[in-house]
Amino acid sequence: MKSPAPSRPQKMALIPACIFLCFAALSVQAEETPVTPQPPDILLGPLFNDVQNVKLFPDQKTFADAVPNSDPLMILADYRMQQNQSGFDLRHFVNVNFTLPKEGEKYVPPEGQSLREHIDGLWPVLTRSTENTEKWDSLLPLPEPYVVPGGRFREVYYWDNYFTMLGLAESGHWDKVADMVANFAHEINTYGHIPNGNRSYYLSRSQPPFFALMVELLAQHEGDAALKQYLPQMQKEYAYWMDGVENLQAGQQEKRVVKLQDSTLLNRYWDDRDTPRPESWVEDIATAKSNPNRPATEIYRDLRSAAASGWDFSSRWMDNPQQLNTLRTTSIVPVDLNSLMFKMEKILARASKAAGDNAMANQYETLANARQKGIEKYLWNDQQGWYADYDLKSHKVRNQLTAAALFPLYVNAAAKDRANKMATATKTHLLQPGGLNTTSVKSGQQWDAPNGWAPLQWVATEGLQNYGQKEVAMDISWHFLTNVQHTYDREKKLVEKYDVSTTGTGGGGGEYPLQDGFGWTNGVTLKMLDLICPKEQPCDNVPATHPTVKSATTQPSTKEAQPTP
């Protein structure tokens, strides 16, 4: 989908030329891409629609994950023949023709475990292996074992795993880190990108691109050999995110690429399909029907693209925070995504240099420098004093402060003075008694107040430390860890998200109940434990008093969350 091209001719910019040269390198590892596995809504057609619409299962993901016991075409033919017969029982038909996903066994930790011991004991519990899957299974096979988040999430998720891997590395499980990098490289080789998760219904989109950072993490243990080994896959993923750029004129967008009027190249989230998500079928149809003024396909695409962002859902994507049907993810240029693209370009430059290709390294450096200028020009709100997303419809930077604003600091793309302003904004508007707020908006969506998420806590902590803002960074870690510890002390589990307006309470909102496990919370908790406790005195639980600032820590904001961005 392209927006109209401007009438005046545009000069070929330096940056697309660089991209052409970078893409030329991809020919060396181009492989035959097999037939893409079809998602269950396509395989099963009206049967899938009917099962989901009558809400046969409380969680729509259940039937999306069910495995047909025979050829779906035969099952569908039987369904069409039987469905109008007297006494037809849809539930019985499904039970006969499908193998439903098993409920995971509830993990009961041994008595008296510390927080660290509990997490270390969870790694094998959350590890799965699926070298082979059934022919019509929505689950995609992976060559190596992998760690799942936990709860209803029975598969590996892209950006979740980076933060899980941080914890694995902290625990010395470098073999598991290597396995998961190998799995993601396999997906790039097989499908041309890393899907949202290893399910057929996730193949039409990706998630925040952390693969290059995963390779960089592995290189901490294996050295430049890891960078050289996975350079082809990093290049291929970059090509996926920049697909279509060679045909863009100023003011146009194509899939995941945006070319602004001055030819600045940035990226957005995008899903290649514009139908309801199989795992949230009924909810998406209801959302689309609730706004008859917009084409349903447009709403479906924006819902899917929000899922690609990892922030599903948030006022960040919505015109009206109380109405999900006003989300327009594809017309927003996200600050976190473009920070990650900058980091990918920097790591590609480093890997190319390690491989002895200095010319290609220079090309990637040129791309990274251009993107950094674009971030500073378009994704900084000078009036508010923080980084924010850019609105393609209004042609202005948005006003809303979110935790995504810390990503330029995390990847070292921020100007020093702006990083200092971000520290002030974070302390004033986002820091709460239980950690960092995702936004300051109460919308009922899970990526809004009062929820705090482990990956965003770590991005903020590490990003602020990168710019010497250690006090604010340590306070974020301290408040969040206290929340995690209090919840663990009471419930003996770690959860997906937390209510940061207090301590000791899991988060709420969103499309499904609170999940426990939980991969990225485990990983970030281990990193933070080792951050707040000195190496000579490591801690297995969160200390009773602030270990760095003994007396007056930075006080979190006590302001009420605002109803609108």
UniProtKB/Swiss-Prot annotation:
Gene3D superfamilies in the cross-refs: 1.50.10.10
Instruction: State which gene encodes it.
Output: treA
Descriptive protein name: Periplasmic trehalase
Q: Where in the cell is it found?
A: Periplasm
Keyword set for this entry?
Glycosidase, Hydrolase, Periplasm, Signal
Record: active site: D312 (proton donor/acceptor), E496 (proton donor/acceptor)
Instruction: Read off the PANTHER family from this record.
Output: TREHALASE
Q: What class of enzyme is it?
A: hydrolase
The record's note on quaternary structure and interaction partners says: Monomer.
Q: Name one GO molecular function term.
A: alpha,alpha-trehalase activity
InterPro entries to which the protein is assigned, alphabetical:
6-hairpin_glycosidase_sf, 6hp_glycosidase-like_sf, Glyco_hydro_37, Glyco_hydro_37_CS, Trehalase_periplasmic
Its recorded reaction(s) are: alpha,alpha-trehalose + H2O = alpha-D-glucose + beta-D-glucose
**To which protein family does this belong?**
Belongs to the glycosyl hydrolase 37 family.
